[in-house]
């Protein structure tokens, strides 16, 4: 029978519940326990797929095509568990499901209410997402005290009773702020946060205290006394310069032991040697490399969370410190590409909308003409095709129909139909809804023999995750190929262009998919590792010249 760890947050948002939950999952997994994760988001959107990156940050895409919260990316990177549609749900999904049941008459004429109907639906979703795991770590989004979170908190309160004391554990992440004028840490916000949680009917078993400096033992004893938890269950979460230090930090304070004792689980000792080896590589780099990250959401780097982590993983596996330079593409439109001259490589990530695209195209042209290693992901590949069409093939005004409906050369256009991995035919038009209508999830890509892509991956067929509704226009592709563009990856059966490269360039690759979603610190990802190696080679050549 599955046991549950519920993770809530208090005082302020963005304390790192996702990292804490993922770290606990990593430690429990190292003890031989099969874990899974769930994220419950209290917003009314059905999913984050149509939300602005400035509002929500990155949208993480799972293998089965769910557009989910970025915390699911942390869960996959920290553990071997694969997330899916059942691992993230929102208030919007819950209400949609309940309303559909009411319309079908499943409630037999009863008055449909938050309690019990909404809370019962939440519990059903939690149990469904936890199937097959020994321990399900369930993170409740938002902050205790938010109106939006109340149905979720009531649902997990009920589960605490229904599942039994030895099958549930409640962890509350809170903030211990340091007040410079007083010269001390303050515990009162934590006391009030726990008080609010207890008023709802939830008594936390463990407190994770986020702080920027060590919490003295007497302060921890005070927190334990006034929050009604055992002193050893007051655990400090200190700021760290790498999220991959957190599993060790929590294990050193016996978090996993306390959780296993609470859930009555007998498990082997934790083995965190993999994490220790990764940290050694991270903290003792032999090389340094500078990468220009040209996008339009660079003021909020959470928008590129998985991509940043994937580049970091490549650094670990090449013994390199990767310095990412975030460059707003609109700045390049205004000031030119001089900022790229000292970079060892250029990366253009995915995105939506016309704003900033000309700056990205200028950066791509700089990388192509100056033989700077280039990696274009999703929109970054599409813009590389547009740049090549304009400046090499001579198709003036070439563009994507996403940005210029009447472009004379629509080298990028809407995908009107394709098959998903199950063989189901998907169709789209310009009139289709925005939400949930993209080509999503894991898709097979066949790599051309003797291509750079084939060399990098080392296999003929790969599976990567997609999130896009526009693709390279095959009707114009032949003219680009005549001038040297090479299509190195295609989707079997549909002929969709998945990867492009330039054979006369040291390292120039574009991919329609998002390889960052499958990178993890233990193995890295071959595409990012090869990209960083190319950047290192360019730097070495420039240094010796």
From Swiss-Prot:
EC number: 6.3.4.2
Family matches, as InterPro entries: Class_I_gatase-like, CTP_synthase, CTP_synthase_N, GATASE, GATase1_CTP_Synthase, P-loop_NTPase
Catalysed conversion reaction: UTP + L-glutamine + ATP + H2O = CTP + L-glutamate + ADP + phosphate + 2 H(+); L-glutamine + H2O = L-glutamate + NH4(+); UTP + NH4(+) + ATP = CTP + ADP + phosphate + 2 H(+)
Residue positions binding ATP: 14-19, 71
GO cellular component: cytosol
Binding locations of UTP: 13, 186-191, 222
Top-tier EC class: ligase
Binding positions (L-glutamine): 351, 379-382, 402, 469
Gene3D superfamilies in the record: 3.40.50.880, P-loop containing nucleotide triphosphate hydrolases
Name of protein: CTP synthase
Organism of derivation: Aromatoleum aromaticum (strain DSM 19018 / LMG 30748 / EbN1)
């Amino acid at each position: 029978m599955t046991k549950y760890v519920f993770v809530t947050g208090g005082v302020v948002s963005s304390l790192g519940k996702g990292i804490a939950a993922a770290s606990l999952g990593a430690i429990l997994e190292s003890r031989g326990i099969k874990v899974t994760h769930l994220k419950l988001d209290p917003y009314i959107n059905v999913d984050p797929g149509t939300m602005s990156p400035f509002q929500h940050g990155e949208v993480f895409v799972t293998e089965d095509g769910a557009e989910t919260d970025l915390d699911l990316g942390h869960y996959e990177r920290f553990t071997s568990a694969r997330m899916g549609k059942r691992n993230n749900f929102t208030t919007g999904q819950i209400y949609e499901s309940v309303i559909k049941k009411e319309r079908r008459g499943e409630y037999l004429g009863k008055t449909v209410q938050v309690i019990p109907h909404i809370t019962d639906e939440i519990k059903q979703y939690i149990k469904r997402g936890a199937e097959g795991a020994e321990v399900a770590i369930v993170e409740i989004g938002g902050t205790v005290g938010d109106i939006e979170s109340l149905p979720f908190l009531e649902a997990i309160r009920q589960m605490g009773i229904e599942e039994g004391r030895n099958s549930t554990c409640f962890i509350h992440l809170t903030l211990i702020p340091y007040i410079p004028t007083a010269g001390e840490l303050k515990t009162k916000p934590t006391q009030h946060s726990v008080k609010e949680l207890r008023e709802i009917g939830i008594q936390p078993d463990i407190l994770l205290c986020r702080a920027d400096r060590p919490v003295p033992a007497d302060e921890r004893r005070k927190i334990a006394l006034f929050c009604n938890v055992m002193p050893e269950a007051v655990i400090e979460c200190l700021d760290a310069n790498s999220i991959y230090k957190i599993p060790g930090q929590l294990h050193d304070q016996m978090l996993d032991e306390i959780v296993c004792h609470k859930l009555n689980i007998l498990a082997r000792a934790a083995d965190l040697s993999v994490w220790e080896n990764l940290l050694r590589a991270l903290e003792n780099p032999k090389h340094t490399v500078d990468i220009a990250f040209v996008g339009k959401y660079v003021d909020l780097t959470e928008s590129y969370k998985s991509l940043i982590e994937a580049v970091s993983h490549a650094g670990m596996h090449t013994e390199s410190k990767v310095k990412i330079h975030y460059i707003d593409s609109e700045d390049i439109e205004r000031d030119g590409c001089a900022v790229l001259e000292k970079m060892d490589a250029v990366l253009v990530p995915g995105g939506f909308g016309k704003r900033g695209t000309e700056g990205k195209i200028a950066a791509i042209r700089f990388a192509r003409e100056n033989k700077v290693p280039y990696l274009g992901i999703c929109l970054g590949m599409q813009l590389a095709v547009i740049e090549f069409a304009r400046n090499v093939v001579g198709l003036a005004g070439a563009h994507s129909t996403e940005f210029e409906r009447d472009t004379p050369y629509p080298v990028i256009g809407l995908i009107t139909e394709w098959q998903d991995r199950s063989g189901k035919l998907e169709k789209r038009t310009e009139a289709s809804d925005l939400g949930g209508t993209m080509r999503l999830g894991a898709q097979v890509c066949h790599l051309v023999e003797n291509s750079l892509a084939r060399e990098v991956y080392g296999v003929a067929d790969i599976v990567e995750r997609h999130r896009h509704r526009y693709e390279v226009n095959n009707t114009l592709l032949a003219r680009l190929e005549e001038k040297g563009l090479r299509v190195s990856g295609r989707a079997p059966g549909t002929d969709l262009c998945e990867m492009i490269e330039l054979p006369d360039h040291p390292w120039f690759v574009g991919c329609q998919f998002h390889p960052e979603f499958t990178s993890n610190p233990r193995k890295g990802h071959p595409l990012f590792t090869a990209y960083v190696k190319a950047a290192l080679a360019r730097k070495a050549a420039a240094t010796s010249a």
